[in-house]
Amino acid sequence: MPRKGPAPSRQLVKDPVYGDVLVSQLVNKVLLDGKKSTAERIVYGALEQCREKTGTDPILTLKKALDNVKPALEVRSRRVGGATYQVPVEVRPGRSTTLALRWLVTFTRQRRENTMTERLANEILDASNGLGASVKRREDTHKMAEANRAFAHYRW
């Protein structure tokens, strides 16, 4: 750890269209090779498709999807006396949001629809309805934490 203490967390910039920090974080997760305008076009197109399909505010749909994907617990490896244990720990709010966005984008890229915009829109809609691979990933993470509950006393 540096002598000056931890680095201060940076203030996130709200995106210009929706005025929401979550959307700008999603744009940054979709971003590849520094092509931000392409990432913005994909995200805004996906949110517009969500609006057309549900008839509701796409930001609310995105927030509901993220709430369904955010993990509350995760396992971290802890080495104790030559054995490595998977120790369940609670996830900090910032990390849970980051993990949710990462999983959403990762499983969006694995989908079979034609365009990235369609894939992202459908993954957001599935996640907001409690379906999809990203929600399954959260459930698997929680199952791992539950299975290793016996090692909870090793946590930091």
Swiss-Prot record:
Bilayer-crossing residues are: none
Asked whether the UniProt record includes Cell membrane among its keywords, one would answer no
Q: Which InterPro entries match?
A: Ribosomal_uS7, Ribosomal_uS7_bac/org-type, Ribosomal_uS7_CS, Ribosomal_uS7_dom, Ribosomal_uS7_dom_sf
Keywords, alphabetical? Ribonucleoprotein, Ribosomal protein, RNA-binding, rRNA-binding, tRNA-binding
Q: How does it assemble?
A: Part of the 30S ribosomal subunit. Contacts proteins S9 and S11.
Which Pfam family, any one of them, does this sequence belong to? Ribosomal_S7
Give a GO biological-process term: translation
The record ties this protein, via PANTHER family, to: RIBOSOMAL PROTEIN S7 (PTHR11205)
What name does the UniProt record give this protein?
Small ribosomal subunit protein uS7
Q: Which gene encodes it?
A: rpsG
List, in alphabetical order, the Gene Ontology terms for molecular function in this entry: rRNA binding; structural constituent of ribosome; tRNA binding
The protein's job, in short, is: One of the primary rRNA binding proteins, it binds directly to 16S rRNA where it nucleates assembly of the head domain of the 30S subunit. Is located at the subunit interface close to the decoding center, probably blocks exit of the E-site tRNA.
Q: Which family does it belong to?
A: Belongs to the universal ribosomal protein uS7 family.
GO CC annotation:
small ribosomal subunit
